Structure formats: structure tokens, C-alpha cells
A protein has these predicted regions:
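Active-site segment of extracytoplasmic enzymes that catalyze sulfate/phosphate-ester chemistry
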Residues: 28-29, 35-129, 133-143, 152-163
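Active-site-proximal cap/lid insertion segments
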Residues: 24, 31-58, 185, 189-196, ...
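Bacterial Sec-dependent N-terminal signal peptides
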Residues: 1-22
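Short catalytic/ligand-binding loop motif for oxyanion handling, primarily in non-cytosolic enzymes
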Residues: 36-38, 83-91, 99-101, 149-154, ...
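Polar, surface-exposed loop/tail segments
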Residues: 91, 146, 150-155, 331-332, ...
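Structural recognition of the beta-strand scaffold that forms the well-ordered cores
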Residues: 27-30, 38, 73-79, 84-85, ...
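Acidic, His- and aromatic-enriched active-site or binding-groove loops in soluble protein domains
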Residues: 98-103, 158-206
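C-terminal, low-complexity/hydrophilic appendages and adjacent surface loops
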Residues: 352-353, 424-504
Length: 530
């Protein structure tokens, strides 16, 4: 009740310290499942790659790399949870996902109970968040792209015609006008629902992953479709300042870099007219054709043609930049490019670096005077405090776990923002300093009883395993466990400064550092306990 009263208070009184004309527009651009760690020759080559500014020389992202060279690159950027939904929650609230009081999460893990953070997190109906606060401060807010942060209970069944949605099958033909109209109806219903969480405009909306459109033909990426929605918003809004949450679906599965047996990629080879609204024809001539993009990358010696999707996305970012420039809004717009989490060497849904470390660059001509690389720790919980700070919003009565990066952006500051970072995923928690990381795996009482009794747990494809994975998603869990031999170890200590791939557990051999890091994690857990 207290939080609801705070929210209602904030809705009528937000302190704004800058005039409307001074406050920057914010364009927050996020990929899906993209690590910041370059892929080595010894690694599996058939996995997502980062941007060129992250040091990967097999990709071609000249537009994004140019923005990075004129802005700030954050070399030590992390997410607090290395899976989609909780990471996005942290970005839109400035809080650790384990604090969520969303209906699905709180029903499974009431306050005071050990939680298992996974894709069970949702934005709350009546608790303040970033877009709601920005709305109250006079910002026009827009949501474009993937959600996965509301109404999980509805998401699983909506295409069966539940909750006021219209039904269609996985094999329904989106080229059929009747089917496409049904898909359009559902898209618009989802979009209107998303508006209730603080967004004035919602378009090109995906309620979850591509497969959660529950149609075989629509299980493809469409960069142009989402990009045009962003450009249309910028073109048609005369309101300033504005905040755009631009959430791409690439490179999440179906991976746009995976070539099937017929030489087909579920992105650049798909029909540009297949969208979250069904079959929709629009003018995308402002972008190079998909064939031209593939040919461009194929023409570069030393580049990996499987990752032409990165140039596809790069062109989309360039289109946003040019639209802002044409409207005279580029200089006073903050452009952020990052990802919801990584998946380097199958570290998604773990607390290892490959899952938690993400690309991050910020471009802001009016605000950033000295382009550079910032080498201190930052985390996705810092986005909301930063955006609220530059918007002039008083956050003194708001629960925020993150810290504002405004001074890093607007001065030459190299000051440390975080001495340490906290991570949570399912049964695992972790703490990381600049040089060390401690990971712990702890089960709840019911799970410990099953283990003691010799019971087994669900594995992938109907198999049984002796120990549970961190999260209920057995596919992700099995990939992480197979890729990281230490996955199930109760206590893991890594000298990440010298062992960045976390191959050697020093918990037993360095008891002094182990005790220090364990106490640090305990203190953090106490501070954020629900």
C-alpha cells in the first residue's frame, strides 16, 4: 500500500530541474542475446558476435562503431540477470529483478520466501517505473519491439482466443487477409495493454519472443518493421522531450546467423512483409535491401558472412540517426546501444561473464564533451537512475538499486560508480568486484530434500538429471551446465582479472579472498531482501 501511495504522489508531483527545451531526448536501443566478448578462433563460431567497437574484427558495424568513437564506450558493462525478462525489468525500474512484485512472480515467491528469478518477472500494475516517471515529468514515451515483461499468464494461451484475443493456429497463413486481420487485432490489443505501463505510443509490438507469436511463418526477424515504427514516431511527434524504448529481437533465436540445410537464414532471407501484425506491406526503400546487405558483407575479406545481421541492424541504427538529424534533434538526443544479456559460449542464464557482460555505448553530442572508454563497473540497473537524472526528476522517494551515470557522461569523470555488482539467476547469486567474482548456488528446502532423497530433476527433451538447473528452462540450463563444468559447484571464486573465462575455481585455495567475497555477497543479499 505504501508503494502505491508513493506512486500516486509521484504522478502529481515530480520535481523537474531543467526546462523542457534543455532536457535531452532518449533513444534506448537494445539487442537480444548479444555478449560484449569477441569470439575467439577456439570458440564455437556459430554463435552471436558483438559489435566492432567491442573488438570483434569479423563483423562490420561502421555506423555503430562511429557513434561509439564519438561517445563513451563502457568496457565493463553488465546486467544483473542474464536472461531476458528480469534484465528488462531492471532496465525499466532501476531495481534488481528479485524485488519484483509482479503478479506471476509474487504468486510463486511471496515476500520473505527465497525467490528463483527467471522469466517469471513482470512490471507491476501500480508501482512506479521509468516510463511512468518520465511521462509525469513531461516526456512523451514510446515502446517499439519486444516486450516479454507483462502478462506471462496471458502470453501462453492468447492465440487460443483467451482473454479477449482472437484465435489462430501455428499453421495459419498470414498471407490470408482473414488471418492477418486476426493477427493485427491481437497486436493492437497487446499494444494498448503495454500503454498501461507508462508508454504513450506502442507499435511494432512483440509480446514475447518470436516463437510466442505462435505461428510458424512469423517465427522470423524483421528489423525494417521495427525500425520504421521508430522513424515514424520521431517524424510524427512534435512533443519534446521524448523517450523511445527500441527493443530488437535479433540475435535471439531463431538465430539470424544460423543457416539451415537449405541455406536459409531466419532474418535476411525471410519475407520483409511478415510482421507481428501479420502480412503488412510498407515502404522500406530508405534502407538497403536484404540482398544488398548480404552482398556487402560477402564482399569483405575476413568478415563472417553469417553475421550480416549485424550490418542489417547497423543500417537500422543509421536510419534513426539520420532521422534525428533531419528533424534537428540529434545533438540533444542520448542514444544508448546495449543488449539485455549475453550468450557467449552458452552462458545465458548463468552468472558467468559470457552471460552477464554486455555491449554498451552512449552517444550524446550536447552532453558528452570528451569521447572515451570508461573502464569501471556499471550495470543495467543504472539506466533508469541516469535517465531520470538527466530528465531532472527528483528520485529521493523512489527505490532504486542503480546509480546515475550522468557525471560520467557530462564530465571527464573516471570515478568509480560501483565497487561491486550483484547478480541473480534462479538458484544462483553472485558478486563481482573489478578483479574478483564469487558465485554461489543454493537451493530451497524442498529442492534440498529431493536431492538428499536421491530424486531426479527434469532435464531437456524428457530426460532426468541428478541436480536441478538454476532456472526451470531445462534447455538453457542444460546448455550452461554442459559448457561450464563448475556450474553446479556450491561455491565458486574466480580471479576474473587474470582468468576472464572463469576456468579455475579458487574457493578452496584462497580462503581469505573467499571469505571476503562471501561476506560481501551476504551483505548485499541482506540489503535487498524482500
Amino acid at each position: 500500500m505504501k508503494k502505491k501511495l508513493i506512486f500516486l504522489f509521484l504522478m502529481v508531483y515530480v520535481v523537474v530541474s531543467f526546462s523542457q527545451s534543455q532536457r535531452p531526448n532518449i533513444v534506448f536501443i537494445m539487442t537480444d542475446d548479444q555478449s560484449a566478448i569477441p569470439v575467439r578462433t577456439s570458440d564455437n563460431q556459430n554463435q552471436s558476435r558483438p559489435f566492432g567497437f567491442n573488438g570483434d574484427d569479423k563483423v562490420h558495424t561502421p555506423i555503430i562503431d562511429d557513434l561509439a568513437s564519438k561517445g563513451i564506450v563502457f568496457s565493463q558493462a553488465y546486467v544483473s540477470t542474464s536472461i531476458c525478462t528480469p534484465s528488462r525489468y531492471a532496465m525499466l525500474t532501476g531495481k534488481y529483478a528479485g524485488r519484483s512484485e509482479g503478479k506471476s512472480f509474487i504468486s510463486s515467491f511471496p515476500l520473505g520466501k527465497l525467490s528463483r528469478t527467471a522469466n517469471n518477472i513482470e512490471l507491476e500494475e501500480n508501482i512506479t517505473n521509468l516510463p511512468r516517471l518520465l511521462q509525469t515529468a513531461g516526456y512523451t514515451t514510446a515502446f517499439i519491439g519486444k516486450s516479454h515483461i507483462i502478462d506471462h499468464d496471458i502470453l501462453e494461451t492468447y492465440t487460443q482466443g483467451t482473454n479477449g484475443f482472437m484465435a489462430y493456429s501455428k499453421t495459419a497463413d498470414p498471407y490470408s487477409t482473414t488471418v492477418s486481420n486476426t493477427m493485427k487485432f491481437n497486436h493492437d490489443k497487446w499494444s494498448n495493454r503495454m500503454k498501461e505501463f507508462g508508454f504513450d505510443h506502442v507499435n511494432a509490438f512483440y509480446p514475447g519472443n518470436l516463437r510466442e507469436l505462435f505461428n510458424n511463418d512469423l517465427n522470423i526477424h524483421n528489423v525494417e518493421y521495427k525500425n520504421k515504427a521508430v522513424l515514424d514516431f520521431i517524424e510524427n511527434t512534435n512533443e519534446e522531450p521524448f523517450f523511445i524504448y527500441y527493443s530488437e529481437t535479433i540475435p535471439h533465436g531463431p538465430a539470424p546467423y544460423w543457416e539451415n540445410s537449405n541455406g536459409y537464414y531466419a532474418g535476411l532471407d525471410a519475407d520483409v512483409n511478415l510482421t507481428a501484425e501479420g502480412f503488412l506491406t510498407q515502404d522500406y526503400s530508405y534502407l538497403p535491401s536484404r540482398t544488398d546487405i548480404k552482398n556487402e558483407i560477402n564482399g569483405f575479406s575476413g568478415k563472417d558472412p553469417r553475421h550480416a545481421w549485424l550490418r542489417w541492424f547497423d543500417h537500422a541504427v543509421g536510419a534513426v540517426v539520420e532521422k534525428l538529424r533531419a528533424k534537428g534533434k540529434l545533438d540533444n538526443t542520448i542514444i544508448v546501444i546495449t543488449s539485455d544479456h549475453g550468450d557467449f559460449n552458452k552462458a545465458k542464464a548463468t552468472n558467468y561473464e559470457g552471460g552477464t557482460k554486455v555491449p554498451l555505448m552512449v552517444y550524446w553530442p550536447d552532453g558528452i564533451t570528451t569521447p572515451r572508454t570508461y573502464n569501471e563497473l556499471v550495470q543495467n540497473i543504472d539506466f533508469a537512475p541516469t535517465f531520470l537524472d538527466v530528465a531532472g526528476v527528483d528520485t529521493s522517494n523512489i527505490t532504486l538499486d542503480g546509480k546515475s551515470l550522468k557525471n560520467v557522461l557530462t564530465t571527464n569523470s573516471t570515478a568509480v560508480i560501483h565497487d561491486d555488482l550483484f547478480f541473480e539467476i534462479g538458484f544462483s547469486r553472485a558478486i563481482r568486484t573489478k578483479d574478483w567474482k564469487y558465485i554461489t548456488v543454493r537451493y530451497d528446502d524442498a529442492t534440498n530434500t529431493k536431492i538428499a532423497n536421491g530424486d531426479t530433476f527434469s532435464g531437456p527433451n524428457g530426460t532426468q538429471v541428478s541436480l536441478p538447473y538454476y532456472i526451470p528452462n531445462t534447455s538453457l540450463g542444460s546448455l550452461g551446465a554442459a559448457s561450464y563444468p563448475l556450474y553446479h559447484q556450491k561455491d565458486q571464486l574466480f580471479d576474473v582479472a587474470n582468468d576472464p573465462y572463469e576456468t579455475t575455481n579458487l574457493f578452496e585455495s584462497n580462503p581469505e579472498k573467499a571469505t571476503e567475497m562471501r561476506n560481501l555477497l551476504r551483505s548485499k543479499i541482506v540489503d535487498i531482501s524482500r
